[in-house]
């Protein structure tokens, strides 16, 4: 958001800190967790959620879906997924049921924080990971930020949207290659690069 000119760096930091504080409060008020389901499609995952009470939190790829919910619902979802033939159905080591309804206690506080900051229209289009669409106005960005708290992350559709929009090169900034691997699984023709240390920053700058 700061790079795109939507928020100043100081306001972006304020938003990150307040969002984290509010989410921790929601975790304390409504404990839960997340689980990875690998090898089942979205339709089957939706059925598992209806039967268990869990919710879809992130659709990483067509065959990798993250569920969130209270601990009882998640345990039930893992059992159902295993019975349905999932390659893996495992709990994740996280502190809460992120991107699900269990984060709703943080919603009013986040909305107030967003409303208090000075948002500008993006200098370049952003892509929302809830709507999987371009965000070109400050109001669209604010709506996306509000929805992200309790809505499923549509990573699979987000990457597909970027590919359909002519984006061919993907850069993962930070340590690790998890997102790069997901992009490759979504479309093997995508060009992915990692910028995770000072040397890779210099290499990118020299090729830019």
What residues fall within each predicted segment?
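N-terminal entry module detector
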Residues: 1-4, 206-208
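Acyltransferase/transacylase module recognition
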Residues: 118-208
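Alpha/beta catalytic cores of group-transfer enzymes, especially the acyltransferase/condensing modules
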Residues: 2-150
